[in-house]
Amino acid sequence: MSVDYANYTVLMPPTPDNQPSGGAPPAAPSAGGARPGDLPLPPYGSSSSSRLVNRRGGGDDGAKMDRRLSTARVPAPSSNKSLLVRSQTGDFDHNRWLFETKGTYGIGNAYWPQDNVYGDDGGGGAVKMEDLVEKPWKPLSRKVPIPPGILSPYRLLVLVRFVALFLFLVWRVTNPNMDALWLWGISIVCEFWFAFSWLLDQMPKLNPINRAADLAALKEKFESPSPTNPTGRSDLPGLDVFISTADPYKEPTLVTANTLLSILATEYPVEKLFVYISDDGGALLTFESMAEACAFAKVWVPFCRKHSIEPRNPDSYFTQKGDPTKGKKRPDFVKDRRWIKREYDEFKIRVNSLPDLIRRRANALNARERKLARDKQAAGDADALASVKAATWMADGTHWPGTWLDPSPDHAKGDHASIVQVMIKNPHHDVVYGEAGDHPYLDMTDVDMRIPMFAYLSREKRAGYDHNKKAGAMNAMVRASAILSNGPFMLNFDCDHYIYNCQAIREAMCYMLDRGGDRICYIQFPQRFEGIDPSDRYANHNTVFFDGNMRALDGLQGPMYVGTGCLFRRYAIYGFNPPRAIEYRGTYGQTKVPIDPRQGSEAMPGAGGGRSGGGSVGGDHELQALSTAHPDHEAPQKFGKSKMFIESIAVAEYQGRPLQDHPSVLNGRPPGALLMPRPPLDAATVAESVSVISCWYEDNTEWGQRVGWIYGSVTEDVVTGYRMHNRGWRSVYCITRRDAFRGTAPINLTDRLHQVLRWATGSVEIFFSKNNAVLASRRLKFLQRMAYLNVGIYPFTSLFLIMYCLLPALSLFSGQFIVATLDPTFLSYLLLITITLMLLCLLEVKWSGIGLEEWWRNEQFWVIGGTSAHLAAVLQGLLKVVAGIEISFTLTAKAAAEDDDDPFAELYLIKWTSLFIPPLAVIGINIIALVVGVSRTVYAEIPQYSKLLGGGFFSFWVLAHYYPFAKGLMGRRGRTPTIVYVWAGLISITVSLLWITISPPDDSVAQGGIDV
């Protein structure tokens, strides 16, 4: 049984038995003596706590005794998840805080003084216990290292496997198979690449860590009464939340509305939360669906606050299994839930009926316009009827400025005006409690009735402009939100991802606002999914990546940005360098060198107006240096010509700083700087937000090049995160005990392969661009560079993987093998490499918390995707780079599911795509090869079954990886589309004829084989 030990620092007070030797007893402190709050704060991790006790009347240095007590805690349960559970917020351990700052008698070390004081028993100058608990000194987060009993063997096994691979490859090179040099050569090339690929993937995993956030400390520091905040008003910074959508028919508006409701109801100060949705399609359906969601939010949000509902996505809440009354204490919960459920059902009906309602409204109003035009034409206006267009109308009887149902110039999906509509205005700065009688059915007494601000955005699109897809939409939201709210932090969501844990944002803030948090550019949350089949056939959960690779990167420079569920520092998105940036010099970046803050920094606009919401911009030496190095007149060249936007940059940087509550906190802001109410929005501000999302605003600026989301790749998220890491920023991986966010993932085989194809295509684009990690700056750590290099290289493994998957079949066809004989040395190396791989897998499962089945599913889909989507991505990328030809892979056939009520009906849909051809070929060739090999052995004059061992075993191993693919092609109850049989037959006939042509059968076939 393992026992964890926590160190305490115990400081002995000046008692009669604890006096300095050879000195007079110290005088008792007077009533007017210095109190703890009047003394300078000690730095973390120093002996300042000892000096503090001494200055309180403990005598000279001889009066201090520093002792450590080791107290054993109850060991955590033995399971894969024990490490994760222990590292989360609910089990935050303040022992380390006590050790790092000032563990004293009053905080539970040795004993609790009966009179609750230090020093004299009744002196007026005694220091009270309350004075010792000074909240600014408590850290908001901490690292939880992986136990050495797991990590040390893991690293040792990596070294052992590396040595084994090296010796194996040396042996393979020095022992060629002279009877089949072509087979030996192909296998050698593949094995060298696999070893290189394994190193790129494995080396960044050498330092995984866990983290823990302290929500209680966050509340105590930012939302509790203090001398600078007497009323306990929230001093947290503002947060802008972005939702992205593009097509209301591909991304159902009801799903988007539920995402919006979960965000509006999250636990964050209402006056500090601002929500935006970017509708890149400019659809009236999305606009009116959001308006319906805002109306429903007026009852849903207070209901969630009153009864502490979780999750706060109404669709997920009402469909989850289990007893809804569990943990609910209010007697009116059942009545309230029944009423709100009925309201939600009516809300769904209204949202689902909107397409028909909008169509009928448009038809009616267009008919009216045509009638009026005919009347004018009859009165003599010949062009009246020709000028009438089939418009789409809003509910107030005006033309919709976005995309019309029947597209026309200035009203098409790629050609429409900017739209900004603030649907929910800034809430009141003070809490607005409900009262009895405010609602006819719900008692909202003492419930905060305010709802966060919400705005609908649709950027301008015009023909002839490159709108840069999602990256362009995100940059438009960044600019508009800077004008309207200017939250120093931004959180982005896809429209199908919602907040599952209403405390998740607060946990992220613990890292951003902790000491040193000003160097963190973003907090990435793991992606969790709902609606996945229980067996996770196509590895949709992807836990090996999210719980393994990303957790390991957190121990380096931080996880990559992988899309939805990421909280950004606005200042970092603007392309600025981090404070106190360092370079990693030397062969492996082992030397850290601080750099001049002016070096390579961006323009720092001067502080000015902007919508700051309280507080002023600090003027420390670093910001002055930035401003001096890059005058303000350069800012429009980078950020555009909006003066209001440029003035907001310095305000956002200042508000995003940690509190300057300790000498060790550099580049901080004073407590209480963000307590002032925000000014209300006015027409000029909204007009400016419309201007900054126009299609011409980015002309002659650095948006998409160095500022904002980076253009030029379909995986703009990875490139954007890479650019920030390359400037020296750090990121943090935030795994919460309860999933922070949840979303949906494609469970259909074709959709899953096309998703992987898009990711792999983006990686190939990264490899052939200036974002290749080989060209990274010295601010990127060596192992972090390897991780980003692997991102650009991994699709190319498909070229070697498909050859290696065909090697067993070629061995069975030819009667040869990759080695001349099954030498004991070869088998020993193979056994050692396999055993070390299995042991590494077991230890990785231990420190990451993933399951063995999840690991195996990931391995299977790596082979499936590697021989289909990755291969297509490499082909697509090479054709684009070399010949400038762009190709696409489309769906050509679809088999309908039988049971529409089955939640996993999509799993059984078979939509034919050309991506199926390579895996089908590998499966067909290996099956035929097994038949040929078995037949050759069975019908030989002298059967030698041992000759099947090499090729037969590896061929079976390849087929085992393709089992989920084959099962997916069978559909439900074996209803496989005809096209699958056609391709399988074509492949079989082609392979058979090809082999007969190359190696016609003769009487000597029976003598073929490998020597054992």
Curated annotation (Swiss-Prot):
Disulfide-linked positions: none
Predominant cellular place of this UniProt entry's protein: Golgi
GO biological process, any: plant-type primary cell wall biogenesis
Biased composition (Basic and acidic residues): 57-69
The keyword Magnesium is annotated on this UniProt entry: no
Source organism, top-level taxon: Eukaryota
GO MF term (any one): cellulose synthase (UDP-forming) activity
Function text: Thought to be a Golgi-localized beta-glycan synthase that polymerize the backbones of noncellulosic polysaccharides (hemicelluloses) of plant cell wall.
Protein name in UniProt: Cellulose synthase-like protein D5
Protein source organism: Oryza sativa subsp. japonica
